[in-house]
């Protein structure tokens, strides 16, 4: 059962990693719900750590989840390698577990969801990164439910 995530990890912060910005969502394993909370700017994939420190301080997550933008054939892309490095940095900086998950279709799904909610399609001025982060986290929550004592 090495793949089982500890029940102690209840509140999870997720990231849709990007070169220009990172979408962020928070979720609860108890309710299996996730909500987009914000989007922070990044310079060539590096976040503003001071800004991120404030968000982590405010939300107090037990763990992190970072979406890996793999190639469609499942192999690592340059961006997924960067996202993996970011995940490792989160763990090192905040001392909390950081997980990664395949997020190949999350941006597409986020755009579809945004369109359903009336998004006009101007993704540069009105990005969907936090919706993508929410979808990434929702997927992770469904794959990692709290374990019940049988």
Where are these regions (language model features)?
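Phosphate- and other anionic-substrate recognition elements at nucleic-acid/protein interfaces
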Residues: 2-15, 19-150
């Amino acid at each position: 059962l090495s793949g089982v995530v500890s029940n102690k990890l209840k509140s999870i912060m997720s990231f849709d990693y990007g070169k220009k910005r990172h979408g962020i969502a928070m979720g609860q394993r108890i309710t299996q719900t996730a909500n987009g909370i914000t989007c922070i700017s990044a310079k060539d994939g590096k976040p503003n750590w001071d800004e991120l420190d404030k968000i982590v301080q405010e939300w107090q997550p037990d763990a992190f989840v970072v979406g890996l933008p793999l190639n469609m054939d499942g192999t690592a892309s340059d961006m997924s390698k960067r996202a993996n490095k970011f995940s490792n940095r989160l763990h090192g900086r905040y001392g909390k577990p950081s997980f990664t998950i395949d997020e190949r279709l999350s941006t597409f799904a986020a755009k579809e969801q945004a369109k359903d909610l009336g998004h006009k399609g101007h993704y540069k001025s009105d990005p969907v990164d936090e919706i993508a982060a929410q979808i990434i986290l929702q997927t992770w929550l469904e794959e990692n439910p709290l374990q019940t004592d049988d």
